[in-house]
Amino acid sequence: IHTRTMKQALQTGSDIRVLSKIKTVSDMRRLPAQKLVEILPALYEKKEGLTFGPVVDDHILCENISDAVKEGRCADVPMMIGVTGNDLSVEDGAWRKSMIFEGVTKLAEARNQHSSKPVYVYAFTRKLPGDDRGAFHSSDLWYVFGTLSRCWRKMERRDYSISYTMIRNWTDFIKNDNPGKEWRAYTDEEKFVRQYI
């Protein structure tokens, strides 16, 4: 998990201030979301890697998340993690080779070294109807939260079926620490990935 230092986070804030031509912190706090979206391409060009993410602030987050998982210093509870098929513009069908999926599987493997609790891995690869963006970042949330009817897209019967299954899986995981019998844990012996197509 890409964890940032406080110095990196403050520099990102400074870069946003400069790119948006804002002079004060007060003005920055009032920056409309649309303005932030407009300057993102310039911000991404200036930065290497992911621009936003968890920050080690020594109050809420006291260490790098990946280090904590690798060294067994995180809550010993079952874990569910996954990817969307076209996150960060990954080409269709290439999600298994993406840096995001690699990060998910490395996290699962590190977690398995220090815990007897299961890790469940998923890939949401359903290409949403309405355009050619595929399974973009956060597109799975409409399905998990059952809010397909609020989306502008013309969802199909298949989408509602996927949503029902995802809601059931997430609910079972929350209630029973297990998302259901058709979803096996990700282990060294069986690298099972539950795919929502």
Language-model regions, residue ranges each:
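Mobile gating loops/cap/lid regions near enzyme active sites that modulate substrate access
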Residues: 102-105, 109-197
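Substrate-access "cap/lid" subdomains that shape
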Residues: 1-109
